[in-house]
Structure formats: C-alpha cells, structure tokens
Design a protein with these regions (language model features):
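C-terminal helical subdomain
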Residues: 67-75, 79-136
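Catalytic loop of short-chain dehydrogenase/reductase
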Residues: 1-59, 69, 80
C-alpha cells in the first residue's frame, strides 16, 4: 500500500475497516495481519499512508509532512526496554525537523535505529553527532 504513489484515503480507510472486521470476526491471524503489536502496526500503516497523501496535498506550500520511527526506544509502551532513550530519539526528530527547507523532503518515512538510515540526510547526521559529542 505505501509503495503505491496513488494510494487514496478511501483505500487506507478500507484497509483499516477490513482489519477491524477481521478482529471482530476473530480471523485476523489467519488473514495475514502482523502478529506482533498488531493494532499498533496497522495504525502506523494508516498514518504513513495519510502522511503521503497530505504531503502531496500541501506540496508547494512550504510545508513538509513526514513520519519518523526512532527505532526500539525506551518508553512505557516497551516497558522501559529499548536500545535508545526517548531523549536520543527526540534529538534526532528535532534534527530532522530543523533541516533547511531545501534539504527536508516531504512525504517520506524516516526510519532510525542507528545514524545512517535517516534518508541520507548528511546534514542531520552531522548535527546529531555534534549534539551527542557535546553531551560527553
């Protein structure tokens, strides 16, 4: 779904409705939905799809719409487990948001568990590294 550049709101909402129907019917496992954090994963799929649509809608209006996944982060959702602190995740998210407009893409999904996978934004990685070093 997310690879389809022409995905529509109706298609996203249809996917969510199908998931909910499958859950109510008790057949969601046999229908191939994610086995781990199922509802979370489906909601993030919908969020990413809507973000892509919004990015197209606001294109040319000096507004970027993106999603960001910091990776396995220590939060209440993970029971305090995770590879990264919420502070570290917030620093990278802030870095992405503060990229100059000409370097910040729109309609993208930023995945980050280690520096280097943030959509090749070298500027962001350099700033993040400087922030990390300043704390030590």
């Amino acid at each position: 779904m997310l690879l389809d550049e022409k995905v529509t709101e109706n298609e996203i909402e249809g996917m969510v409705r199908l998931f909910l129907e499958n859950v109510k019917s008790g057949i969601w496992r046999s229908q191939g939905w994610p086995a781990v954090w199922t509802d979370y994963a489906v909601s993030k799929l919908a969020l990413n799809g809507h973000s892509k649509i919004m990015a197209k809608l606001f294109k040319g209006r000096e507004l970027s719409v993106n999603c960001f996944c910091p990776g396995f982060t220590q939060t209440s959702m993970t029971g305090g487990k995770g590879k990264y602190t919420s502070q570290a995740a917030a620093e990278v998210a802030t870095c992405i948001v503060l990229l100059p407009p000409e370097k910040l893409l729109t309609g993208k999904f930023y995945v980050g568990s280690t520096p280097g996978v943030y959509s090749n934004h070298l500027h962001c990685l350099v700033v993040h590294e400087k922030m990390r070093r300043a704390k030590t």
